[in-house]
């Protein structure tokens, strides 16, 4: 079974996204993608949701 992790980022810069991706990949999660939430009044995203996956741990 696949387990999903969603990390919310309210600061959407390349440095912030790189930090989040590197942090969670180092913890054993596989990067799966990014979804951006846009503001109507701006071309820059208001926030980002960084998606990760990994195989479920047997309990």
Question: PLM features: what roles do these ranges have?
Answer:
Residues 1-59:
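Terminus-proximal functional modules
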């Amino acid at each position: 079974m696949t387990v999903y992790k969603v990390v919310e980022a309210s600061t959407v810069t390349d440095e912030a996204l790189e930090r989040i991706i590197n942090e969670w990949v180092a913890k054993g999660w596989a990067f799966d993608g990014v979804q951006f939430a846009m503001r109507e009044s701006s071309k820059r995203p208001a926030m980002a949701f960084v998606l990760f996956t990994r195989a479920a741990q047997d309990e």
